[in-house]
Amino acid sequence: MPEVSERNQHGITGLGHVLTPGEIDVSHGTILYLEDVMVSFDGFRALNKLTLSIDVGELRCVIGPNGAGKTTMMDVITGKTRPDSGKVFLGQTFDLTRMSEPVIARTGIGRKFQKPTVFENHPVWENLELAMKTNKGWLASLRSKLDRAAQARIEETLELTHLERDAMRYAGELSHGQKQRLEIGMLLMQQPALLLLDEPAAGMTDHETMQLADLLNKLRGTCSMMVVEHDMEFVAALSGDTGRVTVMAEGSVLAHGTLDEVKRDEKVIESYLGR
């Protein structure tokens, strides 16, 4: 059997022990792999031989014009859309094209849409508690007692998301940016192997955007992430000088490299940045 390491608190595996059933094999250092993925809707080719990979612990920003196929790509990864052809693997273990959407979610892929989804009539603490107990109904979850380790995880997540002072506030009272961070915290409570974030900075103030960038940068290296975004300042805050950025256009990868490299690419300027 291939050898991989134990998962850390965010669900990542690496080198170290014998692979057990249900565990993600990332012994080659790759958490997500897509090859020649094709998707068509009524004759329109949404994805056209899309090929890309994401390393374990990487924070990958994906940019591109509207209609480039970014959302369709996420739909394929999460099982919402079935590709016409191509390969989509989580690590070397799971062929996502053969799995249903609920099974993929349980396997370790968390997705955050642009609009935050939280339990507005429950306090922040209970939102995190409910997210951690996804195998139970919400009422049973609230009635069951947390052990000390679970309480510590919630406290750590509150601190990480800068919501420790808002733990007892109802989620509906939070600002838009706070709700976005809360939902990311809820996803982290499920210990995902990969987080997909679709325009998480949309609608945020500049201060909230930088708070979110700080949160995601803290997760870099411990949680693999794909961030689809249009806000180039936010992308710059996430990618820095060395982070990799993928530019999509017409359903495939147009360019790939550091942010400075893709911004100088003539194809990118013509297709996206120059518009």
Roles of regions detected by a PLM:
Residues 170-174:
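Conserved ABC ATPase signature
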